A protein has these predicted regions:
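A composition-biased, non-transmembrane "mature-region" signal
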Residues: 2-236
Length: 236
């Protein structure tokens, strides 16, 4: 009887084991990075397209200066209507050096002009609250005390410039793979935050945004979930 002894397979060295584990993890991470990089490219592409479109649109609106159908109210003491686009532009901000085309945000700024300044007359006790709300609404103003013949302050009078400063900011959130759109003073004295999928920031959405600015439609507000409404609603 002949016995044949099979040679044992050499056990991998400790360094070989580390190498195998390292290579496996590198492969997993590379596979995970691929959709992440694709998501980043989708977000950056959407932001650049939005900037180019808004830059041209605001240039045309600044020339045309169309009427705006919104009515802006602040409490029961100030109302601006009969508005029109006065000026506006689009801008962007990049991330730090070495980040390529990655954008920190895209923003559209514009001003609405009313026909005449507003005058708000309130009691001295209400003056501090009114001043705070005027500042929160980004309105420019100056105030003076109204004094009677006995040198007693009867009212505080605010002279408010007939200009509403508004903005729309597109800010990427790469972790959530979303684009947050912050509207400030667009259709009221208030800030609203919407959360968009990158693919949803397309030309039809931007068209709806301009229609919202002009007061022609509020369809833009229904294109994405409402992420946040500023806890201080300055218009009420």
């Amino acid at each position: 009887m002949v016995f044949c002894w099979m040679s044992e397979t050499p056990r991998p060295s400790f360094l070989d084991e580390l190498r195998q584990r390292s290579e496996a993890l590198q492969a997993q991470r590379a596979a995970a990075r691929l959709p992440e990089e694709e998501a980043r490219h989708a977000i950056d592409g959407a932001l650049w397209r939005a900037f180019r479109w808004l830059d041209e649109a605001m240039g045309h609106l600044e020339v045309i200066r169309p009427d705006v159908r919104h009515r802006f109210r602040l409490g029961d003491y100030l109302t601006f209507d009969a508005l029109q686009i006065d000026s506006g532009f689009a801008a962007f901000r990049r991330h730090g050096l070495g980040t390529g085309d990655r954008l920190e945000h895209v923003e559209m700024f514009y001003r609405l002009a009313a026909t005449k300044p507003a005058v708000v007359r309130v009691s001295p006790l209400a003056a501090a609250s009114v001043e705070e709300r005027l500042r929160a609404a980004a309105l420019h103003f100056h105030s003076e005390a109204e004094i009677d013949k006995e040198k007693v302050v009867r009212n505080t009078v605010f002279h408010v410039e007939p200009t509403i400063r508004a903005s729309v900011r597109f800010k990427p959130d790469y972790r959530r793979r979303a684009i947050d759109v912050m509207l400030r003073n667009v259709d009221r004295f208030e800030s609203v935050l919407l959360e968009f999928e990158p693919t949803a920031v397309d030309e039809p959405a931007l068209e709806d945004l301009v229609r919202l600015v002009l007061g022609e439609s509020n369809a833009f507000l229904h294109r994405a979930p409402l992420a946040h409404v500023n806890s201080r609603r300055v218009g009420k």
